[in-house]
């Protein structure tokens, strides 16, 4: 799968040099002359990627762009590159979720491993998101009765409790549970509960571990 590195820096020479270096390393590269330029061309997250971001720029600076992207729900990992390193800036950036903070001039031995780590992190994030998107779509395939059973199963109800709540037999409820598991494709009941919680179906409810 192709990956894209987004380079944000007001220094045209740096952008050109970085684009050349990263292209030679096999990455797709998009360059931006300012933080606002990136916001105006907000990157798609349909492919794995990361952002190489200068700390000091006219207008929005790097940390301010980091905050904006976070509020927009972006999951692109950020690697800061700065010619003026200082400990407070580095600490704030890392605490806010930056992958790394590198100092200009940055060597390939520092840059490429940092990018590889960021890309791996984003690939994991996208895989989790895709799994949740699939889970949401599979829930829509449940029949009304299966959805009722599903709602009780993820709250830890036994077959007997579910049958009492819905007015059916344990045998019928067990059959519905089997179909729910087949349709939603979790590896276990524990994963079913975890997925349901991550897509917001449990709210703040306290859920016990479901029994088989």
Mark where each language-model region is:
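Recognition helix of helix-turn-helix DNA-binding domains
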Residues: 158-191
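Acidic, metal-coordinating helix/loop segments flanking the phosphotransfer/catalytic sites
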Residues: 31-50
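Receiver (REC) domain active-site loop signature in two-component systems and cognate sites
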Residues: 57
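C-terminal output helix
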Residues: 86-88, 102, 106-115, 161, ...
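Active-site residues of response regulator receiver
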Residues: 54, 82
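Basic, Lys/Arg-enriched C-terminal extension of HTH/homeodomain DNA-binding domains
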Residues: 181-212
């Amino acid at each position: 799968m192709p990956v894209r590195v987004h380079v944000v820096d007001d220094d045209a020479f740096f952008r050109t040099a970085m684009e050349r270096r990263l292209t030679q390393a096999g990455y797709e590269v998009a360059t931006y002359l300012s933080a606002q330029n990136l916001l105006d061309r907000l990157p798609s997250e349909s492919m794995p990627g990361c952002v190489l971001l200068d700390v000091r720029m006219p207008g929005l600076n790097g940390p301010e762009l980091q905050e904006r992207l976070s509020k927009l729900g972006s999951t692109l990992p950020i690697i800061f590159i700065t010619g003026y390193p200082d400990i407070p800036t580095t600490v704030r950036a890392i605490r806010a979720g930056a992958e790394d903070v590198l100092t200009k001039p940055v060597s390939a031995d520092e840059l490429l491993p940092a990018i590889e780590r960021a890309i791996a992190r984003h690939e994991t994030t996208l895989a989790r998101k895709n799994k949740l998107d699939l889970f949401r779509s599979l829930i829509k395939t449940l029949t009304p009765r299966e959805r009722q059973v599903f709602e009780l199963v993820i709250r830890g109800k036994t077959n007997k409790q579910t049958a009492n709540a819905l007015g059916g037999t344990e045998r019928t409820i067990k059959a519905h549970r089997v179909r729910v598991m087949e349709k939603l494709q979790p590896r276990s009941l524990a994963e079913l509960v975890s997925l349901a919680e991550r897509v917001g179906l449990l709210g703040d409810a306290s859920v016990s571990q479901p029994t088989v």
